[in-house]
A protein has these predicted regions:
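Residues on a specific face of well-ordered alpha-helices
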Residues: 121, 125-128, 132, 166, ...
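Short alpha-helix plus adjacent loop in nuclease-associated cores
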Residues: 106-125
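A charged, well-structured terminal subsegment
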Residues: 127, 131-144
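Residue-level signature of catalytic and energy-coupling elements of molecular machines
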Residues: 31, 79, 130, 168, ...
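Flexible beta-alpha connector loops of hexameric P-loop NTPases
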Residues: 18-22, 53-57, 115-120, 159-160, ...
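Conserved G1/Walker A P-loop phosphate-binding module
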Residues: 3-9, 140, 145-241
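Short acidic/polar capping segments at secondary-structure boundaries
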Residues: 106-107, 135, 174
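N-terminal accessory targeting/assembly segments
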Residues: 1-110
């Protein structure tokens, strides 16, 4: 089981609602579950009804100030946006709020890193994390410094993600080559299964829909069953008679 000896982070969720409907509150309910799976606690949430998203700060100026006050009042250690933030939005919000700023993508990648168990899964997750991070390095020195630890910063096996742009490029190149070899090996195994003429059935569904539970019931596979989003990540094959 994943262990985190760091102090539990406390965050505030925020989003812009362009339609003034029910979807954004539902999205934040799911985001709160994601945050919990990543190992943090949600203290509150903020939604701004707006016709458009601010290119520089995502939220309007007044709401940014309200969010900063909320962070100070509740003692939050960070904020999480339901949408994917651009590099400039993340940088500006970090400066305005004076706290750690994350988005949904960072949380999901963090969970993937937490639950990846196979070599290929770990390679895929770290590669995705580094590509996401490399696109956000320009002009984000302060942000990356603040993201020095905790959720949103951990690679597979609790390894701290690289922040140096040159080293990231080198690591991406190596991961891509290693992953290419793993994919080639998996393709060989797939062809062998196809040539065996044994029917192949896949269990598919949204996260936390019960796929692992069904697999265990059918095959006694013994894979992890947990009432969390993305509790299991890597594909699993079992024989069923």
């Amino acid at each position: 089981m994943y262990e985190n000896k760091e102090e539990i982070e406390k965050v505030i969720l925020f989003a812009v609602d362009l339609d003034n409907g029910e979807q954004v509150p539902a999205n934040l309910d799911e985001l709160e579950e994601l945050v919990a799976t990543a190992g943090a606690e949600t203290l509150g949430r903020m939604i701004q009804n707006k016709d458009s998203i601010e290119k520089a700060t995502y939220l309007g100026t007044g709401k940014v100030e309200d969010l900063r006050d909320m962070v100070e009042r509740l003692g939050a250690t960070g904020v999480v946006c339901d949408d994917e933030l651009s590099p400039i939005q993340m940088k500006n919000l970090e400066q305005e709020l004076d706290t750690k700023v994350m988005d949904r993508t960072m949380i999901i990648l963090d969970i993937f890193a937490k639950h990846a168990t196979t070599r290929e899964g770990k390679l895929q997750v770290e590669l995705a994390q580094l590509k996401y991070r490399s696109n956000r390095l320009i002009g984000m020195g302060q942000v990356m410094s603040r993201l020095g630890g905790g959720i949103g910063t951990r690679g597979p096996g609790e390894k701290k993600l690289e922040v140096d742009r040159r080293l990231i490029r080198e690591r991406i190149s190596k991961l891509s080559a290693d992953l290419k070899d793993d994919i080639a090996h998996r393709e060989v195994m797939r062809k062998q299964r196809l040539n065996s003429h044994i029917p192949i059935v896949s269990i598919v569904g949204y996260t936390n829909a019960g796929k692992s539970t069904l697999l265990n019931h059918m095959t006694q596979a013994g894979v992890l069953e947990e009432d969390k989003l993305f509790a299991t990540l890597d594909p699993t094959s079992r024989n069923y008679k």
